[in-house]
Amino acid sequence: MNNLNSENMCNCCNSANSCGGTNGISWDREKCEYCGPCAIKCPNDAIMVVNPKGLELPSRAKTERANEFKMCDLCGTCVSACPTEALQMGKIVHNEKEYDRIEFTPSLCDSCGACVEICPQNVLKLNEEYKLKGFCVMCLKCIDACDKTNQNALSLK
């Protein structure tokens, strides 16, 4: 599954080539070369890329798939599904503009997995060390990594 529906339209903003919610990070599939620095730099594993050689990043697992991109699009489905309110929609300011972001309070998380099961992008993961990974905190490290490749496939909306 990726962020595009069967008509190759973004599930959240309904545009043809970009994805990333209505107020966050936009992905332009026409510019993307699936090279993966964005996934590697993301501190919360909110991006998964399968490169042309079939290497899934950031995990570096070999797969038969190729050229796949998934990211947290800040849709808030996980927040709605969380029975303990460990996940909340928050705000962050970049360049004087306010953006949505997901905030996580580990002490409230009961590891029920409701958020993981309902995530439409299939990027959330429960683990023992951090409890939950895969949600976007809008740190913008992915955009910086993509800019360094001169692809500019990721940008702020």
Curated annotation (Swiss-Prot):
What are the record keywords, sorted?
A: 4Fe-4S, Electron transport, Iron, Iron-sulfur, Metal-binding, Repeat, Transport
As recorded in Swiss-Prot or TrEMBL, the protein's gene is named vhcB
In this protein, which residues make up the domain named 4Fe-4S ferredoxin-type?
A: 23-52, 62-92, 100-129
Determine the domain of life of the protein's source: Archaea
Q: Which PROSITE patterns match?
A: 4FE4S_FER_1, 4FE4S_FER_2
**CDD domains from the xrefs?**
MtMvhB_like (cd10549)
**InterPro entries per UniProt:** 4Fe4S_Fe-S-bd, 4Fe4S_Fe_S_CS, Polyferredoxin-like_ET
Q: Which Pfam families match?
A: Fer4, Fer4_7
* Cofactor(s) annotated in UniProt: [4Fe-4S] cluster
Q: Name one GO molecular function term.
A: metal ion binding
Q: Which residues form a coiled coil?
A: none
Protein name in the entry: Polyferredoxin protein VhcB
Give binding positions for [4Fe-4S] cluster: 32, 35, 38, 42, 72, 75, 78, 82, 109, 112, 115, 119, 136, 139, 142, 146
Q: Which Gene3D superfamilies does the entry link to? A: 3.30.70.20, 3.30.70.3270
Q: Which species is this UniProt entry from?
A: Methanococcus voltae
Give the cofactor note text: Binds 4 [4Fe-4S] clusters.
